[in-house]
């Protein structure tokens, strides 16, 4: 069987289990001629267990208007906000600290995001997460010194 020709790649961040044909999902998929209802049903079924999180999805659209999608891990920023128990990061992160996480929480988040991080091991992944935390005004406790 010949490979299908790819006509589009759509990246979206949608609440898990709550995709609807309303914007932003409908217009993004409609522009590529994808069956929106079919996608929303498939996405909601695939993300049902992760309700409450935002789950990024990469949708590959083919020439015959069929599609497949790959789920990513939730954004590091959202996982950090949940771990710190806060609503949003700081507007001026290097002056106002809005919360704190421990190094172990950074390692836990790095383990969750392992396949999407560009790191060789969990320690390096945790360092990436810690950097994200600092840029959001979240203090990292017990972090190893460089």
Swiss-Prot record:
Gene3D superfamilies named in the record: Ribosomal protein L11, C-terminal domain, Ribosomal protein L11/L12, N-terminal domain
Q: How does it assemble?
A: Part of the ribosomal stalk of the 50S ribosomal subunit. Interacts with L10 and the large rRNA to form the base of the stalk. L10 forms an elongated spine to which L12 dimers bind in a sequential fashion forming a multimeric L10(L12)X complex.
Q: What does this protein do?
A: Forms part of the ribosomal stalk which helps the ribosome interact with GTP-bound translation factors.
Q: Does the keyword RNA-binding apply?
A: yes
In alphabetical order, the GO MF annotations are: large ribosomal subunit rRNA binding; structural constituent of ribosome
Q: State the family named in the UniProt similarity comment for this chain.
A: Belongs to the universal ribosomal protein uL11 family.
The family database entries (Pfam families) matched by this protein are listed as: Ribosomal_L11, Ribosomal_L11_N
- The superkingdom listed in its UniProt entry is Bacteria
Cited SMART domains:
RL11
- The molecule here is called Large ribosomal subunit protein uL11
Which PANTHER family does this one have? Answer: 60S RIBOSOMAL PROTEIN L12, LARGE RIBOSOMAL SUBUNIT PROTEIN UL11M
UniProt modification remark: One or more lysine residues are methylated.
What InterPro entries does the record point to? Ribosomal_uL11, Ribosomal_uL11_bac-typ, Ribosomal_uL11_C, Ribosomal_uL11_C_sf, Ribosomal_uL11_N, Ribosomal_uL11_N_sf
Naturally occurring in which organism (per UniProt): Corynebacterium jeikeium (strain K411)
Transmembrane regions: none
Biological process (GO) annotations held by this record are: translation
SUPFAM superfamilies, per database record: Ribosomal L11/L12e N-terminal domain, Ribosomal protein L11, C-terminal domain
The alphabetized UniProt keywords are:
Methylation, Ribonucleoprotein, Ribosomal protein, RNA-binding, rRNA-binding
Question: Under the cellular component aspect of Gene Ontology, which terms does the record hold?
Answer: cytosolic large ribosomal subunit
């Amino acid at each position: 069987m010949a490979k299908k020709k790819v006509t589009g790649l759509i990246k979206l961040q949608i609440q898990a289990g709550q995709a609807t044909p309303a914007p932003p999902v409908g217009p993004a998929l409609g522009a590529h001629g994808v069956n929106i209802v079919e996608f929303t049903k498939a996405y909601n079924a695939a993300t049902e267990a992760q309700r409450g999180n935002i789950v990024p999805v990469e949708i590959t659209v083919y020439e015959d208007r069929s599609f497949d999608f790959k789920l990513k891990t939730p954004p590091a920023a959202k996982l950090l906000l949940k771990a710190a128990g806060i609503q949003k990061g700081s507007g001026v992160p290097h002056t106002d600290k809005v919360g704190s996480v421990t190094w172990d929480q950074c390692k836990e988040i790095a383990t969750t995001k392992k396949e999407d991080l560009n790191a060789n091991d969990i320690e390096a992944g945790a360092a990436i997460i810690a950097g994200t935390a600092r840029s959001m005004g979240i203090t990292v406790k017990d972090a190893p010194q460089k």
